[in-house]
Every structure is written in structure tokens, then in C-alpha cells.
Amino acid sequence: MSNLYTIDAKLFEPAAIDAETAAFNERIEKELSVAPPLYRFEPQVIRDARAAGYSVFGPVKHLDQARSRFVPGPGGDIPVRVFIPPKVAGVYMHIHGGGFMLGGADQQDEFLAEICKACQVVVVSAGYRLAPENPYPAAPDDCEAVALWLAKNSRREFGTERLVIGGESAGANLSVATLLRMRKRHGFRGFRAAVLTYGGYDMSMTPSVRRWGERYLILNTKIIEWFHENYVQGANVFDPDISPLYADLSGMPPALFSIGTLDPLMDDSLFMHARWLAAGNRSELAVYPGGIHVFNFFPIKLAQKANTRINDFIIGAVSDNL
């Protein structure tokens, strides 16, 4: 594990990958080798299949403890999934992944329920309009609306103003975009930390994405290009609202960047961690040998390690000592 400022080169060596992770990766790659790549399907076909449990993620489980609500947004009501612990230490605004095209606020109940329980935080998972039907800026517009709702209402709704924001993959991108919008448009700096897990922060594509090629480990270069094209649809990929790697990152909250070494988006986290620090912010980088994209959603020890680190970071962010 790296500390705040240095990266151990040994983490990137094949020998650093434990046997369980290697076997898991081999199984996933074998399963996907006989599956057509995502870009051969219409997005709604993929969404329906995933909702029915036909994916490497298995069945979608909805928990009784979760509550579905709606927050007013620029394109209509925005669905949010809410988990409330017995004692509230803070609020975690979660933004789901899915390449800006897939996923939903209600598709990771077990994952979010564990964060709620372990960290004693209310979890508010934001749904947002999906591309290509709703390209940029629909997704960040919706996430901004949920963040603004929390900024105005979290004390009345949940008894606290201790806010943390975060997400995975596209959700990490949208988390940073939301922080930047809240600072620029509303003068709001109330998020105490950002949990940024294997995000993609450069729609022009970092070297690790460009060089990855066809190897199909959840993502590959062409799938990422497909996601980007459907989301951006002709907008400027260097716009910091789309590619926050190019943003003025001054005044951002402490962040935890988590990335696996077998994720095409690895450089995005390495670069963003460096830029976060260079802007004068606190940043931690957690590098996981052999971790593939979305590895922390699967029942392996590497996932437990990553999720424990994330939970500890959230606990620290909402503590009285911050």
C-alpha cells in the first residue's frame, strides 16, 4: 500500500498479485471471452439484462432497509436511494458507475448498506439521467442538484451537515465534477472528503487507456471509447466539467483514490492523485495489485481490503477530529 506521497513500484509487479486475485481475474476473463463486447448492444438491452441478473455481477438485490426518494432536478425528479443507520455520524453522497450509460441508484444496495453500517453514515445514492438518451451535461446537472439539495437540507433531513461525496468509475468523475460545480456556482465547500474509486478523469484518454488494447477485463480500450462517445457526443473533451483532470483543483477536500493495477483507468487515478496534491490538497492513493475494474464489488479478499480502507476514510472524514 502506498502512503500519502510515494508509490511503491513493487505494487505494479506481477509477483505482487496474490493467488486468489489471479484466479478470480482468470475466471472473469474466461467468462467474458465468450461474451460479445458491450458496444455491440443497444444500451437499454444491456440495462435490462443487468437488471435481470445476466452479467458477471449476478442478480441485483434490493434490500428492505433501503428507501427510494426523489429530489427535484433540472430534467425532472431525480431518484435517490437512501440508507439510514441507527445513529448518524454523517452523510455520504454516492454516485454510481456504469460509463455514464448503465447502472442506477438502486443497483448496489448490499454495497451501500455495508457502508451505512460500517461508517454510521446516511447513504444517499444519486440516480442520474443516462447517455446516450441524455448526453452531457445531464448527468452532472442531476448530481449537482442532489448535492445542492443535501447542502440545503441535510441537517433538517438527517440531523447533520457532515457531508462526504464519492463514487466508482463514472461516479468518481461525476463526484469531482460536482465538487467543482458546487465551489464555482454555489460557493459551497461543505463536503469534507471525496471517495474516488477507479475513476476516469480524462475523456481524451490517458496512456493506460490508450495502450490497454482488446484484453477484456470488464473494460477495454474500445469499450471505454464507446462510453465516452455516447456521453460526450461532440462536446469538448478537455472541458474540466467533462474531464476534471484539467480543472483548477485548488480548495478541494481530502481525497482517497483507489485503483487496481489491472484496470485500464490506472493512469487516471495516478495522475489525478498527483494533481490533487499539487493543488495543495490532501490526497491518499491506494493501489491494489491485480485489481481489475470494479474488483471491490466481488467476494475476494482484495475487495475486502479496499472496502475497509474506504470505510475507514469515510469514518475519519465525518469524525469530530477533522
Residue ranges and their predicted role:
Residues A89-G98:
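Short beta-strand element of the alpha/beta-hydrolase
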Residues F257-I259:
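Short beta-strand/loop motif that positions the catalytic acidic residue
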Residues R156-S169:
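Alpha/beta-hydrolase fold nucleophile elbow
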Residues M1-V82, K301, S319-L322:
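A glycine/proline-hinged amphipathic helix-loop "lid/cap" segment
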Residues D106-A126:
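Short amphipathic alpha-helix adjacent to the substrate-entry channel of hydrolases
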Residues L180-A235:
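Hydrolase active-site cap/lid region
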Residues N134-S154, I310:
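Alpha/beta-hydrolase active-site loop
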Residues P299-L322:
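Catalytic active-site module of serine/aspartate enzymes centered on a nucleophile-bearing elbow/loop
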